[in-house]
Amino acid sequence: MQLYDSLSKTKKNLNKKTINLYCCGPTVYNYIHIGNARPVILVDVLTRYLKSRNIKINYLQNITDIDDKIILKALDNNLTELEISQKYTKAYLEDLESLNINQPDKIILISEKMNEMVKFIKDLVDIKAAYELDGDVYFDIKKYQNEYCKLSGYKLDELISGKRIEIDSKKKYSLDFSLWKKTQIGIKWDSFFGLGRPGWHTECVLLIDEYFNHQTIDIHVGGIDLKFPHHENERIQFIAKNNKELADIWLHNGHLQINDEKMSKSLGNVILVKDFIKKHNKNTLRWIFLTTNYTQPLNISDDLIYQANKFFEKLTNLSKKTIQFIIKNDLKISLIKQSKYIDQFNNYMDDDLNTSLVLSLIDSLIKQINKNILDNISDNFNLLISSLSYILDVLGFKDVFNYKFKKEIKELFLKWQQLVKDKEFDKADLIRKDLIEQGIL
């Protein structure tokens, strides 16, 4: 399998039997929006596929439950920071479940790792990669200026202009970023440097460093908006501490737009996941994200949502026709995990998750199954529906194509057919209503 690495700007081979993976999690001060869902759906599709190829996954995600935004939210709502973070952590996990996203193997709250965070920062100070200044601690970029910005591609002199950084006259160098900040507001912890809180960029790298035992991980995933400064600053801290790369492959998903406009609070077009799910099929967002390569920007338009709805309508109708066809022809269906269609699916997925071609393959399968039903051809029917079901399952679509039924359903359907044949329409209509309710007609 090959995946596009943002650092080398090339597709890199992934040929391991065990994959260590990290994806940046949410800062839990609000409900997540559909842009936040893109990287976690990307990881879900990737890990489901790798598992289908018998590859073991060790997937870690953080939850940032200490942050200035959480403090402000707590003050505005007259609640504690813990109450805010617990509320939105619960909401985040519920959103994952609603989107049929498998939870990571390990989720770690940043607040649970404060002692380790302080030690990590102290270690960077001890090796002169960071320095303390009046209770604040900053990373010393000048020591690593030959490595810094290799991920984002920015030039240091462009950043120094102040366009991409916050200017702080206290620092040795304007690009030096905060590892520990002295504060008297909100929850704080004691440290070698005094009372304060860790910087956001240190939180993720500490978890990676500790959980994966100071080793380079295979894949780091996140949105393109986090490439700089967050991922850049994660990477440089890991290099400073361990003298090795943080990740072999950096996966970055593209930006989202809503009807050709940037999603932003000022435009009032931010769509929360929980609201999107109430309005649309729970699988719609996944289908939308799969229509284009994950690295590309994506415009979510009314037309694209309409196309998604039509896709699921096709599958619903196909499910009904498939069950009827199986009953009429008394077919025995067994699950098949090997076919030319599944081989083609694997080839597309191996090519940097070429999911747009996968969706085309699914459409071809739907057309072929419909043709077999129309022409009453039962040859290869088992292979066709098994291939379709397998591919949809690996992609993480839930309850979109069902060809299984109980013995009672078969008996009811055959009885209905006989009543229609015998022109006992009143009795047939009663059974027909039952079959419609159960999704057979």
Swiss-Prot record:
InterPro entries: Cys-tRNA-ligase, Cys-tRNA-synt_Ia_DALR, Cys-tRNA/MSH_ligase, Rossmann-like_a/b/a_fold, tRNA-synt_1_cat_dom, tRNAsynth_Ia_anticodon-bd. The keyword Aminoacyl-tRNA synthetase applies. Binds 1 zinc ion per subunit. It is an enzyme of class 6 (ligase). It catalyses: tRNA(Cys) + L-cysteine + ATP = L-cysteinyl-tRNA(Cys) + AMP + diphosphate. It comes from the Bacteria. GO terms for biological process: cysteinyl-tRNA aminoacylation. SUPFAM superfamilies: Anticodon-binding domain of a subclass of class I aminoacyl-tRNA synthetases, Nucleotidylyl transferase. ATP binds at residue 265. Its main location: cytoplasm. It holds the Pfam family DALR_2. PANTHER family: CYSTEINE--TRNA LIGASE, CYTOPLASMIC, CYSTEINYL-TRNA SYNTHETASE. This is Cysteine--tRNA ligase. It comes from Mycoplasma capricolum subsp. capricolum (strain California kid / ATCC 27343 / NCTC 10154).
